[in-house]
């Protein structure tokens, strides 16, 4: 036996939900709306001081865009693919299998010319929407699989080495003869989640939901943008003082996108954006949208004097195309003088040769 580190697969029980996916979603929003979650407490203060109001706004927006959100969530579900379409050599290499699965779904989408075909599930496609408020009012990692036609006992879910595998077996009987087919899907897990707490549920209309809490640095400030995506706020002056010098970001004086060495043979994304002094750290947001990193700011100021009340509003948004995406929760951002500096490790794509 090899002396290398072994990555044993951990089985994740599939629990049956006695409700539909839509009902589960409604119950989530209603529970948070009625104060059932912990987002009003002090247990998640490290996110931001205004996190409770951020969650309240997200709940209101989710109700208003209900139909659009349900379509988006269903389009983003992972499809289970038949294993008999893949070669044995591919099956023995998990990263090659994930790559091949992505290509197969993309080919189907291109042939059909439809966005209604389930997402490729590649890093570029799903991480931007993989974080959402959970029942406890905190940010959770959530992915969903279209498992219609399967029962919970037909599905085996395992996690190993930063990936999760959904394996399903389906038996049919035609003219007295039994036929069995196996389906599978692998998804690479981001390092920002607590994979020891992965939970799996299956709704009564065939949606398999995988969920886990996230690990957030105590000095990291999370918020939600207008689309409900998780965004990172730059560290405040007090937070920067608490950061070790080795982790402090440095402005290089080159505005825009560049790359820096990460010290271990890889590359980190480095972006510098000049910001007007009117913007404070709490006015700025960084989020990831597919293969783009987006920096935006919004400042609203009200003033009262003997002539009455007046208000001013300023905003900006800049985006930068990147060759590979990043995990939104891996972004580190600081304001250095009048420059917003952000860095994040690139999600490594495993090259496949053919």
Swiss-Prot record:
Gene Ontology molecular-function annotations: unfolded protein binding
Family the entry assigns: Belongs to the small heat shock protein (HSP20) family.
The organism's place on the tree of life at top rank: Eukaryota
Record-level GO cellular component terms: cytoplasm; nucleus
Pfam families the record matches: HSP20
Span list, region Disordered: 1-21
InterPro entries reported for this sequence: A-crystallin/Hsp20_dom, Alpha-crystallin/sHSP_animal, HSP20-like_chaperone
An annotated GO BP: response to heat
Keyword Repeat: yes
Protein name, entry field: Major egg antigen
CDD domains: metazoan_ACD
sHSP domain segment(s): 122-233, 251-354
PANTHER family to which the protein is assigned, alphabetical: HEAT SHOCK PROTEIN HSP-12.2-RELATED (PTHR45640), RE23625P (PTHR45640:SF26)
């Amino acid at each position: 036996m090899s002396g290398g580190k072994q990555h044993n697969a951990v089985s994740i029980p599939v629990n049956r939900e006695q409700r539909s996916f839509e009902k589960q979603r409604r119950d989530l929003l209603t529970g948070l709306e009625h104060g059932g979650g912990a987002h009003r407490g002090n247990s998640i203060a490290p996110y931001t001081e205004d996190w409770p109001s951020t969650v309240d706004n997200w709940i209101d927006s989710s109700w208003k865009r209900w139909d659009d959100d349900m379509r988006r969530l269903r389009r983003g579900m992972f499809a289970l693919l038949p294993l008999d379409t893949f070669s044995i050599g591919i099956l023995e290499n998990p990263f090659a299998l994930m790559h091949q699965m992505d290509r197969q779904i993309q080919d189907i989408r291109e042939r059909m010319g439809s966005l209604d075909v389930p997402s490729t599930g590649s890093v570029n496609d799903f991480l931007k929407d993989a974080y959402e408020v959970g029942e406890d009012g905190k940010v959770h990692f959530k992915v969903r699989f279209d498992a219609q036609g399967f029962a919970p006992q037909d599905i085996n879910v395992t996690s190993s080495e930063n990936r999760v595998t959904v394996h399903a077996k389906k038996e049919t009987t035609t003219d007295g003869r039994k036929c069995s087919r196996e389906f599978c899907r692998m998804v690479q897990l981001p390092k920002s989640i607590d994979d020891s707490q992965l939970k799996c549920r299956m709704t009564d209309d065939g949606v398999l939901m995988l969920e886990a809490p996230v690990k957030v640095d105590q000095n990291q400030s999370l918020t939600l943008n207008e689309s409900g995506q998780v965004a990172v706020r730059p560290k405040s002056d007090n937070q920067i003082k608490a950061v070790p010098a080795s982790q402090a970001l440095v402005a290089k004086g080159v505005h825009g996108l560049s790359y820096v060495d990460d010290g271990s043979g890889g590359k980190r994304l480095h972006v510098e954006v000049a910001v007007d002094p009117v913007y404070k750290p709490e006015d700025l947001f960084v989020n990831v949208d597919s293969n783009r990193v987006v920096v935006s700011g919004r400042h609203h100021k009200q003033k009262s004097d003997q002539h009455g009340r007046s208000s001013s509003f300023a905003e900006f948004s800049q985006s930068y195309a990147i060759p590979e995406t990043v995990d939104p929760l891996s972004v580190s951002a600081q304001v250095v003088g009048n420059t917003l500096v952000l860095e994040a490790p690139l999600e490594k794509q495993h090259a496949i040769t053919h």
